[in-house]
Amino acid sequence: MSPKTIVFITGAFVHHSCWDEWKKYFERAGFNTLAPPWPFKDASPEALRNSHPNPEIASNRLATLIDHYERIIKQLPENPILIGHSIGGLIVQVLLQRGLGSAGVAIHSVPPRGIITFKASFLKAGWGPLGFFTSTKRSFLMSFEQWQYAFTNGMDCEAQKEGYYNYAIPESKLIVRDTLSKAAKEIGRAHV
């Protein structure tokens, strides 16, 4: 029997409503879909931005986020198809390693630990979110200029503004840092 449930996993800095059009598409094709928010992020993008700096969001860690999605998946009647973007793509890989998905799609995934680039563009985009030399008790909210550079550099200015208003939210610096830790390491299960 083919799975009929899809779980969408959001990346960092982006509200889970970014999956709304994807959900509609797959629901029209007969799938059940979920796009659960990350812990402490079940509010509108505007409300989350207005809550910045948010110590609860700042406390999120990659391992607890992976466990959050594991709990959601284990409550489902079947192993779902997993689709994730960025850190969500990395989470998809880890969940598949744990046998918690029937299939997975990682869109522009953050790579597992041990795979890194030192390109200037990557370092520029990642320096602020990594939050070195700043308090990890404060969430990080990209400025519009950082959003333009790191997320929407191929879009016209109006689309960039719309994307920022509709989707940009504060993030935990610890989650971004954790992508460099053992929490982000694949454990070697076969890939197809």
Language model: regions and residue ranges:
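Gly/Ala-rich beta-loop-alpha elbow adjacent to hydrolase catalytic centers
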Residues: 83-88, 92
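Glycine-rich His-Gly loop
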Residues: 8-12, 86, 109
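Flexible "cap/lid" loop of the alpha/beta hydrolase fold
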Residues: 101-136, 175-183
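Alpha/beta-hydrolase active-site loop
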Residues: 53-75
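Active-site signature of alpha/beta-hydrolase-fold catalytic machinery across serine-
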Residues: 21, 94-95
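Conserved alpha/beta-hydrolase catalytic His-Asp/Glu region
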Residues: 141-176
